[in-house]
């Protein structure tokens, strides 16, 4: 039964799907899930929106922030630096328009998505808009001869990857335009391949090419990427989504380009091919987080295996305590329709159940007809899915996975999450400078939201990458007396939590603080009733 309005602020955090959360077995947990369980106020999963023509005005961005956008993604495969600079300016203007109210202010992060080392076809008949029809069974010659760079047609196709003849074999497959067109290699020469069209269709200019299974030796960071990354450092972006990462060395190269000035930018590696999946552990070790980029991945590995790769990557990221983003086609049909398909709803929910920290929208918000509806839909689905996570089992397993650690901060984080379960805390309040304390708490996946109070704007923005962290930016001057300064920040978190309906007077919250100034000393845990 719905609660009367007078109790609208009631903390549903502890009670949503509580019966299921306390089950002894996973089967019993599934049996107890209840569609009438009232949803919580807080959503713990981050929502990343790609900003494009449909969403780059300040007014639209304001509405998207209100609807739940946490991170704005700029896709550098398209657009000039001037175009992106204006988008970044608009995102910041939209974010700052809420700054007058510190309680409702939400820091929004900016992410730069690199184009990465791609292989592309040439121009069809010298025009960017011309198309030719490739018929099934027809013969198509692939050439490296630059004379054909702008003269491709249905008989001959130029590619910009010089080593293609070395890395593909007779019998190999070549996919063009997101896998819509497939070719099989019949014969190879020094600078050409003869292929047969297996799946035809109309082919436009400058389309992407995939070579599944081939050991492509393109540089990890292209010349364009270097310029884009330097632009990102100048624009003070918060994170980089690095495309087509195949090995740890690729991540180090991105890090090198970002340099000293960009050393605090988080690098999220996009796994988009077989080699990236195979060498996942070394990539994870070198990265700040991972994106499961299902688009290209679904061409490079068989479509029916993508879900295996998704579960494996999310599992390993959860075990390592690093953020993971699930992306591509999450609500694809909402580009043209106001409601998602049932399959898409399940896909978003299952990404959350798998353990994704963030879920991403691409075309839905960049060029779709219903950008706001797509953000709201992801918000609603994620909120329901989070409550259906079997937290009891998950916490036990995460605690067991890190039982070897002797890091005091990790012990504090684990203890605070365990305490939050035991006393049904409505939230965990963490005071953090670098963000590390909050990240460690998030690692153990508490049911309750983590309100992370920081004075560092970048720490606040980057916190959205981690599930369950609600960053609160404290703009008050530091008080001389440390204890008073701690109280100031804890009270700010209490006010934010009450205003957002996370908890009400009399609820219990867990407070994690340091006992002296500086980063790296979070070592005091208190269980505090909300005043």
From Swiss-Prot:
Binding residues for L-serine: 70, 106, 464
N6,N6,N6-trimethyllysine modification, residue list: 3
Chain positions recorded as beta-D-fructose 1,6-bisphosphate binding sites: 432-437, 482, 489, 516-521
Modified residues (N6-acetyllysine): 62, 89, 166, 266, 270, 305, 322, 475
Enzyme class: transferase
This protein's record includes keyword Ubl conjugation: yes
The protein's Enzyme Commission number: 2.7.1.40, 2.7.11.1, 2.7.10.2
Positions of K(+) binding: 75, 77, 113-114
Residues in cross-link Glycyl lysine isopeptide (Lys-Gly) (interchain with G-Cter in SUMO2): 115, 266, 270
Region Interaction with POU5F1, annotated ranges: 307-531
Entry comment on modification after translation: ISGylated. Under hypoxia, hydroxylated by EGLN3.
Function according to Swiss-Prot or TrEMBL: Catalyzes the final rate-limiting step of glycolysis by mediating the transfer of a phosphoryl group from phosphoenolpyruvate (PEP) to ADP, generating ATP. The ratio between the highly active tetrameric form and nearly inactive dimeric form determines whether glucose carbons are channeled to biosynthetic processes or used for glycolytic ATP production. The transition between the 2 forms contributes to the control of glycolysis and is important for tumor cell proliferation and survival.
Protein name: Pyruvate kinase PKM
Species, as recorded: Rattus norvegicus (Rat)
């Amino acid at each position: 039964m719905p609660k009367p309005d007078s109790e609208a602020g009631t903390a549903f955090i502890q009670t949503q799907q509580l019966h299921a959360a306390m089950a002894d077995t996973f089967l019993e947990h599934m049996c107890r899930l209840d569609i009438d369980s009232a949803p919580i106020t807080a959503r713990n999963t981050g929502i990343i929106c790609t900003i494009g023509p449909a969403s780059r005005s300040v007014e639209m961005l304001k509405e998207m922030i209100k609807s739940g956008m946490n991170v704005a993604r700029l896709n550098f495969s398209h657009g000039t630096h001037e175009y992106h600079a204006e988008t970044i300016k608009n995102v910041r203007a939209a974010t700052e328009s809420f700054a007058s109210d510190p309680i409702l202010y939400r820091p929004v992060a900016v992410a730069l998505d690199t184009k990465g080392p791609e292989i592309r076809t040439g121009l069809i008949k010298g025009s960017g808009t011309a198309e030719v029809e490739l018929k099934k069974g027809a013969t198509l010659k692939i050439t490296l001869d630059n004379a054909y760079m702008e003269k491709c047609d249905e008989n001959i196709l130029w590619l910009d990857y010089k080593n293609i003849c070395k890395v593909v074999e007779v019998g190999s497959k070549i996919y063009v335009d997101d896998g819509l067109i497939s070719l099989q290699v019949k014969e190879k020469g020094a600078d050409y391949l003869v292929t047969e069209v297996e799946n035809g269709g109309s082919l436009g200019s400058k389309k992407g090419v995939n070579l599944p299974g081939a050991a492509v030796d393109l540089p990890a960071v292209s010349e364009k990427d270097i310029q884009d990354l330097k632009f990102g450092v100048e624009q003070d972006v918060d994170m980089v989504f690095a495309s087509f990462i195949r090995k740890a060395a690729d991540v180090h190269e991105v890090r090198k380009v970002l340099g000293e000035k960009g050393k605090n930018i988080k690098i999220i590696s996009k796994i988009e091919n077989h080699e990236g999946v195979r060498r996942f552990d070394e990539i994870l070790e070198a990265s700040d987080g991972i994106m499961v980029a299902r688009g290209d991945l679904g061409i490079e590995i068989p479509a029916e295996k993508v879900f295996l790769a998704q579960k494996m990557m999310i599992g390993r990221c959860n075990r390592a305590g690093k953020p993971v983003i699930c992306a591509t086609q999450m609500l694809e049909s909402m580009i043209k329709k106001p409601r998602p398909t049932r399959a898409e709803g399940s896909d978003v929910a299952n990404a959350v159940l798998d353990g994704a920290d963030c879920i991403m929208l691409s075309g839905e918000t960049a060029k779709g007809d219903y950008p706001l509806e797509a953000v709201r839909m992801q918000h609603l689905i994620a909120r329901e899915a989070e409550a259906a996570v079997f937290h009891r089992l998950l916490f036990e397993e995460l605690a067991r996975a890190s039982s070897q650690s002797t890091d005091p901060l990790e012990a504090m984080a684990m203890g605070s999450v365990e305490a939050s379960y035991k006393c049904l805390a409505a939230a965990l309040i963490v005071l953090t400078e670098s963000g590390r304390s909050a990240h460690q708490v998030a690692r153990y996946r508490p049911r309750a939201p983590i309100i992370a109070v920081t004075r560092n704007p970048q720490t606040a923005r980057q916190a959205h990458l981690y599930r369950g962290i609600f960053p609160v930016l404290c703009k008050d001057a530091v008080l001389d007396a440390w204890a008073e300064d701690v109280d100031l920040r804890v009270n700010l978190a209490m006010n934010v939590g009450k205003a957002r309906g996370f908890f009400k007077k009399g609820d219990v919250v867990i407070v994690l603080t340091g006992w002296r100034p500086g980063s790296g000393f979070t070592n005091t845990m208190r269980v505090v009733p909300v005043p």
